[in-house]
């Protein structure tokens, strides 16, 4: 294990867009990953940054992100690539970080490498969501993979941790019933909330006022109108059920109308996962909250995200 005063880690790059928000299929996990990697480059204080990727072009994406963060720095860091088939080289660093629940797969990769042993390095995964079936499979597989107490599966909140623990408990009960297992081991599930770089999102007061005025004009909002903003993927199955919000806004709109109050608007700034989602969400909005004016805005653009 690495005993340096500032422990380093190897960042796994599963795909070119794993740490980028510029792609067409933007998800919250990519935004979180981008923020984490940028902060790692900016604040870790290391002179060497390591990644593990299947291909050189994926490692080059990692290096380009680092070079962008370190523009203007006098001391230029070194960016190093470890190919997946050379996973044993992580021994010199001490920890492998994966931006998803990939601990089980990586533990098997560690075990199958003839030059690596289980105690050479820790594997740490991150669980951004627990709703998708593939994510649940990856988490459950930790119970039958060569995963040890020095590995970990990070949860960004207590609610996610509770969900993951319940899933593992159910899977462990099944293994005891079906296979007669007497010992089932799972890694720690530490809670580490996601950090937000507030300074990167902040704007001077004058710019804030200008942005606000421009958007309200674009959405045809009067000074008296009330606007509710939703920002995120518009996916009814794997992101969020918007029905409680739509119901509440319809009740609020009816009350405002009865009191001759301001008009209520809802801006859904996001992006649809599929045509099915778009068709059904638009129909649901029209049916559930007919007294609320709804505006759909593409939330993937830099202007909208700012």
Predicted regions, residues:
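Conserved donor-binding/catalytic core segment of Leloir-type glycosyltransferases
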Residues: 222-239, 246
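Short donor-sugar binding/catalytic loops of nucleotide-sugar-dependent glycosyltransferases
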Residues: 18, 231-238, 272-273, 300
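A short, active-site helix/loop in glycosyltransferases that binds the activated sugar's phosphate group
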Residues: 140-211
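Short hydrophobic "strand-cap" motifs at the C-terminus of beta-strands
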Residues: 126-127, 156, 195, 230-234, ...
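Nucleotide-activated donor-binding/catalytic signature segment of Leloir-type glycosyltransferases, i.e.
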Residues: 260-272, 278-306
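N-terminal pre-catalytic "stem/leader" segment of glycosyltransferase-like enzymes
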Residues: 1-93
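Extended catalytic core of nucleotide-activated donor transferases of GT-like folds
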Residues: 57-146
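Nucleotide-sugar donor-binding and catalytic loop/hinge architecture
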Residues: 114-118, 183, 205-227, 255-261
């Amino acid at each position: 294990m690495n005993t340096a005063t500032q422990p380093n880690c190897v960042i796994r790059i599963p795909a070119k867009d794993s740490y980028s928000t510029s792609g067409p299929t933007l998800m919250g996990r990519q935004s979180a990953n981008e923020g984490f990697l940028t902060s790692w480059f900016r604040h870790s204080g290391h002179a060497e940054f390591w990644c593990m990727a299947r291909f050189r072009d994926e490692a080059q994406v990692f290096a380009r992100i680092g070079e962008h963060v370190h523009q203007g720095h006098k001391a230029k860091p070194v960016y190093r690539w470890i190919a997946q088939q050379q996973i044993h080289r992580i021994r010199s660093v001490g920890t492998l970080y994966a931006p998803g629940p990939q601990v089980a797969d990586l533990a098997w990769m560690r075990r199958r490498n003839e030059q690596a042993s289980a105690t050479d390095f820790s594997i740490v995964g991150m669980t951004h969501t627990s709703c998708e079936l593939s994510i649940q499979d990856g988490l459950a597989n930790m119970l039958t993979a060569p995963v040890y107490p020095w590995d970990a599966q990070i949860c960004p909140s207590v609610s996610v941790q509770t969900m993951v623990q319940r899933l593992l408990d159910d899977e462990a009960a099944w293994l005891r019933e079906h296979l007669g297992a007497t010992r089932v081991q799972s890694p720690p599930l530490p809670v580490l909330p996601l950090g937000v770089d507030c300074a990167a999102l902040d704007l001077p007061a004058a710019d804030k006022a200008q942005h606000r005025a421009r958007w309200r004009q674009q959405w045809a909002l009067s000074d008296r109108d009330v606007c509710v903003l939703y920002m995120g993927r518009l996916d009814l199955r794997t992101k969020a059920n918007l029905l409680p919000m739509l119901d509440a806004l319809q009740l609020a709109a009816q009350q405002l109308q009865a009191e001759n109050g301001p008009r209520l608007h809802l801006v859904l700034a996001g992006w649809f996962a599929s045509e099915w989602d778009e068709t059904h969400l638009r129909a649901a909005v029209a049916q559930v909250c007919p007294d609320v004016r709804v505006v759909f805005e593409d939330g993937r653009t830099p202007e909208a995200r700012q």
